[in-house]
């Protein structure tokens, strides 16, 4: 039988040992513009500058230019960018796994996220993840949720996050930006089509990874030398913490915040704490590397970053030994289940995971 099952439990077996981690380093990047058109390069790079507080995140909701995320993009933009880099350098980008950051976040957080499930497809050209099916399912679940009386809608709460980003970003570094531009950010139309996507080379245990993912902003400027780390900033919003229950909810959020930033090598996260009406009253700066220790020693200890990393290393090693031949494979974890199933859904081909242009390029190079 093709495939197999990996049990996350008992997680105690992932405790203690220190997995070797290769620091994520950006090897290339790409951008989507305001119409979500793909471009090589950093044209959509944005710069962080502190927003004015209090900040009303509801403002402009009626003019929100929202990305249509129903389109099936697979790995096309990521593979296009890797192909351009290989043509430029004359060297192949070697990796065991090429995927989006969102897919790896689900795997990394799985030991402490029993409630949520995921599905992704993979193929053995190099193992590659694609997240369209999962996104469609997630959207349906959100639409069917009934919000408690007095709570903002899911759409409005999603908008709050994008509004917060708009209030925190500049199109160029602070120094040459006119004061009027900085102070008029509250009036900008929010558009989440434009994105800067970093492509990094990293490693967890013996698995070499190339991961692509959106980055919100840079703290200062990108360094001239590619070897130097980049002072990326991830922007998040969260409800004010009023009691112990809120603290546990926030800690669980921190797991995702940490995993997303850890995978791309983002050193700093800025959280805007908002009330139930969508008004941000305070900011908190978090160092990504210190979050697991903070949760362990100062919080309720709801998760352990070391266990996440050790689990990811073991699971990816198992995945490589399970998916060793062509065809399309499904990687699936059901909600409230500790089992990750891997099974073949198509005997041959790559199931549209890998673009024709990339297949042609690799067969020639």
UniProtKB/Swiss-Prot annotation:
InterPro entries: RAI1, RAI1-like_fam. Divalent metal cation. One of its GO terms (molecular function) is metal ion binding. This is Decapping nuclease RAI1. One of its GO terms (cellular component) is nucleus. It holds the Pfam family RAI1. GO terms for biological process: cleavage in ITS2 between 5.8S rRNA and LSU-rRNA of tricistronic rRNA transcript (SSU-rRNA, 5.8S rRNA, LSU-rRNA); deadenylation-independent decapping of nuclear-transcribed mRNA; mRNA processing; NAD-cap decapping; nuclear polyadenylation-dependent rRNA catabolic process; nuclear-transcribed mRNA catabolic process; positive regulation of termination of RNA polymerase II transcription; termination of RNA polymerase II transcription, poly(A)-coupled. It is found in: Nucleus.
